[in-house]
Every structure is written in C-alpha cells, then in structure tokens.
C-alpha cells in the first residue's frame, strides 16, 4: 500500500504542475507542499518528543483508569462490574468523539494553539478528577474522566497534523510516525505503573494530581518547541461546521453511552434503547448535513473504499485490544489475586514488545504495502486474545499469558502507523488535522464501545456475577470475533488492491474507445 500511496503522490504532483494556475480555494483537493521549517537538531528532537507525548499521555490516561480500577471503585462505594467499566469507557468515549472536531478546529485556528490548549484542559480536569474523591460519587468521577478525555482529543490529531505538515513523505517521516505509535503501549504502561504505585502504596488521587503537573509542563514546552507554521490562503477562509458538529457528537455520544449503560441498568430499561435509536438517527442527519455544507467536518470527497476498509480494520482491532486489556487486568487481579503493582510488572513486556513492533513496522513500510501490514496486525490482535481467553486460571504466567502479552502489542503498533501514514500522505495539507483525526477517532471510540458490547456479553453470561471466569472468557470471545472481522476485511483489502493493479495494467476495450472518442 505504501507504493500505492507514493504513486498517488506522484500523480497528484503532476496534477499540481498542470493546474498551478487554478485558485486553491476552489480546488481544495490539490495537495499543498509541506512547509520547510528550519530547526536545529536539539530543537527537532524536542519537537518530535513533545508531539509524541500526545499519544503517550492519551494511553497513560487510559492506564490510570484501568490499573487502580477496583481500588477507586471501593473508595467510591461500588464493586459493580458495569460501573467499574465506565471508568475507562467514559474517558475513551470523549477521546474518540471529539477528535474530529478538534482536528477541524486545528485546521482553522492552528494546530499549535489547539495542542497547547489541550494540555491546559488536561491539567484542569486531572486536578478535578483527583478532588472527586471527596464527592464519593461514581457519577462525578465518570463525568470528570469524560471531560478529561476531551484533552487527548485535541492533542492527538493536532500533534499528528504538525508532524504531517513539517515532514514530507520519506524514511524520516516513516520513522517518526513509527515512534509515535510506539509510545502507545509505553504510555499505557507508564500510566499503569504510577497509578498502581499511588493507589496501592499511597492515595489514588495523587495519580491525577501528578498528571496535572506533567501536563502543564508539557504545555509550556510545547508553546516554545513547536515551530510556527504559517496559515495559507485556503486555511484562512475555512469555517467551522457547527450543525454537523452537533449531530456528529450527539450521535456518537448517545450510541456509546447506550452500549456502556446497558450492562449497568439492563437493556430492558426504556431510556437505554431510546437513546441508542436517537444516536443512530443523529448520525444519519450528520451524513446528510455533511453532504450539503460547503466546508464539512468530514468531507465525503476524502473517503474512498481503500481508506474505509483500513478504518474498519482499525476499529475491529482496537475494539479487540480494549477488551483484551480490560479483562486481562480483571482476570489477573480477581482470579489470580495479583496486586495492581504485580499486574503492572507482568505487563512490562508490552512496552518492550511495542517498541520492537514499532521499529519493525517502520522498516516494513518501506518494503510492504500497508494493507499487508494491516493483515499481520489484525492476526496479532486475534491470536493474543485467543491465547488469554483459553488460559486456565492456575496456569503459570509464563505460558499463555506471557505469550499473549508479547503478541498483542504488535497489533497496536503495526495498525496505527500504517493507517496514519496512509491517510496523512493521501489527503491535502489543509485536511491533515481531519486525516489524523480519523484514525485516532476510530482507535479510541472503538475501545470504548467495544468495552460496552463486551460488558453486555459478560453480564448476561456470568450467572449474575457468580461465575466470573465464564463472563471474562465470553467477553474475550467477543473480542476474538472483532479481531477475526479485522483479519477478514484486511485480507479482502489485499485482494482488492491486487485486482485494482491488474485492471490498471490491462485496460478494457470500452475505456480505449471512450478515450479515442474524446480525442
């Protein structure tokens, strides 16, 4: 697929040379050249580092919701599995929901501004999340975590857009995007380690207060380290689609809320399925609005079949990952009776394996099409989940559990860079924020809604909480189904790419006649 992307870049460059006299505002699909930014080596290292912290802190925030999950729940007066799953789900919900809007705002007002504001917002709501301990309310904590999730929604797409605009397609860009992807498992591990230390040995609110301190430091570094990128004429004339934003966010929030609230109160409660229906209707209205507005949040012209298939794979794979991670933690704590710190230690290979996967992906992207890399990543998600789903409770950690922890990060760090690079190189410069948003939206939203679906399966099959292992295995089997779907779609995408190449090499007779007639 990388060759496909490069060929598209060559094709579009030729088009730019032919149509350079056209007005860029009227032809927004014309890719604009990457701005040349002069930076010293130290400045460039700091810039790449602060951009990668966006992914690091996003996944650290998820780790903070999962590692001390049971300790936080007990301090707030709940041990209900459905309510506990809301801790990570509420965070991932807003991360995935607001990314598209944040990317669009970055395109309009500047990616650097949105990036710095994202860290300031992260700081504020991390502070409040810690103080929610005094409210002794699960709902209060969930709301705080949901509002905290808006911050990574601003960080991720704008960080990726900044990298996409500073670096042209090439080896350096491939390496940087691979490093960006490598921070995902290490960010989760870092968040889990510190939250486990504070929750088990001190006091869990310090997890969030420490995060607030780190975020304000990153905001200051970002303000000085991120280079100034001049807005072009196209960006200055862009406007925000408020109507599309309203229906898009409403639809995504209501659908996700329904799926995650169903396991808590039961699907027989009227407001759960009513909100689900309203959510789907809102998304239908969103699609209709986007087709009619002049400057939509998600331009229909940006999408094609190849991109759609890749995004489906990402959604299926990361839904599988969210289920794998959450229930692995519950399995190790509740059935193998490990402490949060011991579980974190057992998950340490995730970071090492993730780095190896990211570097390998950066190497493979120069030699294989991203569609093939996507197949491998989906297989990694699926195999990792199958291994833990079939692991006996009293089996040694070094058997299936360890292998599962080694294999699964390859799904994370192969799928994210491949999908992000393809979209970043494909779309025009003024849509870099939206391109970055698409992958990040699908990743985080699928984690949240995947947990909701798995939670529904778990609560219906664990015999009202008596048979924990049956509920956990059922959730993992649901995750395996998601992973299998990703494998199938990825394989179909590979075949489709070969068919497309074959058709291009052997044009049919009617096409020749049509071109002859035009001449």
From Swiss-Prot:
The UniProt record lists the keyword Transport: yes
- GO cellular component: a single term: endoplasmic reticulum
Single Gene Ontology BP term?
ammonium transmembrane transport
What's in the keyword line of the UniProt record? Endoplasmic reticulum, Membrane, Transmembrane, Transmembrane helix, Transport
Q: Which Pfam families match?
A: MFS_1
Q: So where does this one cross the membrane?
A: 37-57, 82-102, 114-134, 146-166, 175-195, 209-229, 240-260, 269-289, 309-329, 337-357, 373-393, 402-422, 434-454, 475-495
Keyword Transport: yes or no?
yes
Citing just one GO molecular function, the answer is: ammonium channel activity
Which Gene3D superfamilies does this chain map to? Answer: MFS general substrate transporter like domains
Record PROSITE patterns: MFS
Please give the SUPFAM superfamilies that the UniProt record associates with this protein.
MFS general substrate transporter (SSF103473)
Q: How does it sit in the membrane?
A: Multi-pass membrane protein
Q: Organism's domain of life?
A: Eukaryota
Q: What is its main location?
A: endoplasmic reticulum
- Compartments (UniProt record): Endoplasmic reticulum; Membrane
Q: Which InterPro entries match?
A: MFS (IPR011701), MFS_dom (IPR020846), MFS_trans_sf (IPR036259)
Family per record? Belongs to the major facilitator superfamily.
Q: What is this protein called?
A: Uncharacterized MFS-type transporter C1683.03c
Q: To which species is this protein native? A: Schizosaccharomyces pombe (strain 972 / ATCC 24843)
């Amino acid at each position: 697929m990388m060759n496909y992307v490069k060929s598209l870049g060559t094709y579009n460059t030729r088009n730019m040379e032919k149509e350079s006299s056209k007005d860029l505002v009227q032809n927004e699909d014309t890719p604009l050249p990457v701005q040349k930014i002069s930076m010293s080596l130290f400045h460039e290292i700091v810039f790449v580092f602060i951009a990668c912290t966006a992914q690091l802190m996003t996944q650290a925030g998820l780790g903070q919701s999962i590692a001390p999950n049971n300790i936080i729940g007990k301090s707030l007066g709940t041990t209900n599995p459905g309510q506990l799953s809301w801790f990570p789900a509420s965070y991932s919900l807003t991360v995935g929901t607001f990314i598209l809007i944040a990317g669009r705002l970055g395109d309009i007002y500047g990616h650097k501004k949105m990036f710095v504001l994202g860290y300031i917002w992260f700081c504020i709501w991390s502070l409040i999340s810690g103080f929610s301990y005094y409210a002794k309310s699960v709902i209060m904590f969930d709301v705080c975590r949901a509002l905290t999730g808006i911050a990574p929604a601003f960080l991720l797409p704008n960080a990726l857009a900044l990298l996409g605009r500073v670096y042209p397609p090439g080896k350096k860009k491939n390496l940087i995007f691979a490093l960006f992807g490598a921070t995902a498992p290490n960010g989760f591990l870092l968040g889990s380690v510190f939250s486990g230390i504070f929750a088990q040995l001190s006091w869990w609110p310090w997890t969030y207060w420490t995060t607030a301190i780190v975020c304000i430091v990153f905001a200051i570094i970002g303000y000085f380290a991120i280079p100034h990128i001049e807005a072009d004429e196209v960006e200055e004339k862009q406007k925000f689609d408020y109507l599309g934003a309203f229906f898009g966010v409403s639809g995504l929030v209501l659908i996700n809320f329904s799926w995650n609230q169903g396991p808590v109160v039961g699907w027989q409660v009227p407001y759960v399925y009513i909100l689900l229906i309203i959510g789907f209707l809102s998304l239908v209205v969103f699609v209709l609005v986007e087709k009619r507005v002049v400057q939509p949040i998600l331009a229909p012209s940006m999408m094609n079949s190849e991109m759609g298939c890749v995004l489906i794979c990402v959604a299926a794979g990361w839904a599988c990952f969210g289920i794998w991670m959450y229930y692995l933690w519950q399995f190790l704590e509740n059935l193998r009776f490990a402490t949060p710190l011991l579980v974190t230690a057992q998950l340490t290979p995730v970071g090492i394996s993730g780095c190896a996967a990211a570097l390998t992906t950066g190497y493979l992207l120069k030699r294989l099409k991203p569609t093939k890399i996507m197949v491998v990543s989906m297989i990694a998600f699926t195999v990792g989940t199958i291994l833990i789903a079939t692991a006996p409770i009293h089996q040694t950690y070094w058997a299936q559990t360890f292998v599962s922890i080694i294999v699964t990060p390859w799904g994370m760090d192969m799928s994210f860079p491949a999908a992000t690079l393809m979209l970043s190189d494909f779309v025009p410069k003024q849509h870099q924020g939206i391109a970055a948003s698409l992958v990040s939206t699908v990743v985080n939203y699928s984690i949240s809604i995947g947990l909701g679906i798995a939670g529904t399966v778990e609560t219906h099959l664990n015999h009202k909480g008596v048979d924990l292992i049956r509920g956990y295995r059922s959730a993992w089997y649901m995750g395996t189904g998601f992973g299998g779907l990703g494998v199938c779609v990825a394989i179909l995408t590979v075949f489709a790419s070969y068919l497309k190449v074959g058709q291009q090499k052997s044009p049919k007779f009617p096409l020749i006649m049509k071109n002859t007639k035009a001449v």
